[in-house]
Design a protein with these regions (language model features):
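Gly/Pro-rich active-site loop or hairpin
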Residues: 113, 196-199
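Active-site-proximal beta-alpha core segment in soluble small-molecule metabolic enzymes
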Residues: 2-182, 191, 212, 217, ...
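Anionic group-transfer/hydrolysis microenvironments
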Residues: 27, 73, 97-99, 147, ...
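Short, electropositive alpha-helical surface patch
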Residues: 152-167, 198-207, 240-247
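Flexible glycine/acidic-rich beta-alpha junction loops that bind and position SAM and/or redox cofactors
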Residues: 101-104, 181-197, 227-239, 272-273
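Charged (often Lys/Glu-rich) extended helix/loop segments that serve as interaction or gating elements
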Residues: 208, 214, 222-376
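Aromatic side chains
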Residues: 2-3, 8, 117, 158, ...
């Protein structure tokens, strides 16, 4: 298992990953640096990304990264050159596009044909990539990788992806009289954001995928390869919440004579872009006190100069909410802090970890001095 660092990574989280003993997948030189700073064994690191720079590739090879997942013909050449220059044989996987329409938002669906990631099985570019890798003595092809998207519920798309990848493993065996030993089926397991949502448990997904892999390998007469998955959201998403302070409460009259209450908080799209980017939905609760007031239909909005800076479009909140109240938005651990920005020059909030009733800061709050630090 590899933890998908893009969901959320900092040095302390990297230390936890090291202590747990699982691997980690990173997709930039920056994420690689954090993983290494946290003491993760480079052999347990996978490097992803559709546009790795030469510098990132050379850093990965020099650091001893266990596997580089190749995403283009250019990249095959670049990794081969970097490995040869370092007098190493670099283990690689090929990222494949199995041509699957995962049922999720179009911005996080990654395995259909019209997408920037991977080599298409259907078009034949995957076979071209196989030939390219095999032409380099500095590369060792270990197997195939596919990631069909994010926030996916159910196993059908994952099982179909496994079926198509194993079909290509069989074709490889028939052509080259040898079997590739690894199959990485990515992540993307959905979590609960609202009451009533049913999350996908990675351990259960792994069992279902293992059964599908075994069945398809038996059909093709293949040995069962080592299977990997890459959960990120499913691990970190439910473990974190964002705590906002209410700044203003405003009632507005709409054109049809109805009213809408706007509750503005001290964050928004700079700490959680997902509602604006994907239309992601969340819930929230009053966190600093209890209230017996009647609920009022409200819109929770951020402090940024954007009409679209909406945290929750429609939510029932107590009628007596006032400035200074605290609102907790759960399930913000994935793609919140990791996609955060300094839009409007708003400093990013801290990250606080809680264990056994004790809290400690693991990423400090940014200051205005931090925002000015790189200016010349």
């Amino acid at each position: 298992m590899y933890y998908a660092a893009k969901a959320f990574i900092c040095t302390e989280v990297a230390r936890w990953i090291k202590d747990i003993g699982i691997g980690i997948d990173v997709c930039t030189g920056g994420e690689l640096s954090v993983a290494l700073a946290g003491g993760i064994d480079p052999a347990k690191i996978e490097l992803h990304g559709n546009n790795k720079s030469v510098a990132e590739i050379e850093k990965a090879v020099a650091s001893g990264v266990g596997t580089i997942v190749l995403d283009s013909l250019y990249e095959i050449e670049r990794v081969a050159v970097a490995a040869a220059k370092a007098n190493k044989v670099q283990r690689v996987l090929l990222r494949l596009t199995p041509g699957i329409e995962a049922h999720t938002h179009e911005s996080i669906a990654t395995a259909h044909e019209d997408v920037k990631f991977g080599f298409s099985i259907a078009s034949g570019s995957a076979w071209e990539a196989i030939a390219a890798v095999r032409s380099h003595s500095s590369l060792e092809l270990r197997g195939f990788h596919a990631h069909i998207g994010s926030q996916i519920f159910g196993y059908e798309s994952f099982e179909l992806s496994a079926e198509r990848l194993i079909g290509l493993l069989a074709k490889y065996r028939d052509e080259f009289k040898s079997e590739l030993p690894e199959l990485d089926l990515g992540g993307g397991y959905g979590i609960a954001y609202l009451p009533g949502d049913v999350a996908v448990v990675p351990a259960d997904a792994m069992k279902a995928l293992a059964a599908a892999v075994h069945s398809n390998c038996q059909t093709h007469g293949l040995k069962v390869p080592t299977i990997s998955i890459e959960p990120g959201r499913a691990i970190v998403g439910p473990t974190m919440f964002t705590l906002y302070e209410v700044g203003t409460v405003k009632d507005v009259t709409l054109e049809n004579g109805t009213h809408r209450r706007y509750v503005s908080v001290d964050g928004g799209m700079s700490d959680n872009l997902r509602p604006s980017l994907y239309g992601a939905v969340y819930t929230t609760v009053l966190a600093n006190r209890t209230s017996s007031a009647q609920n009022v239909s409200s819109r929770l909005v951020g402090k940024h100069c954007e009409t679209g800076d909406i945290v929750i479009r429609e939510i029932d909140l107590p009628d007596d909410i006032v400035p200074g109240d605290l609102l907790a938005v759960p399930a913000t651990g994935a793609y919140g802090r990791s996609m955060a920005s300094n839009y409007n020059h708003v400093p990013r909030p801290p990250v606080v970890a809680v264990k056994d009733g004790k809290a400690r800061v693991i990423v400090r709050r940014e200051s205005e001095a931090d925002l000015l630090r790189l200016d010349i």
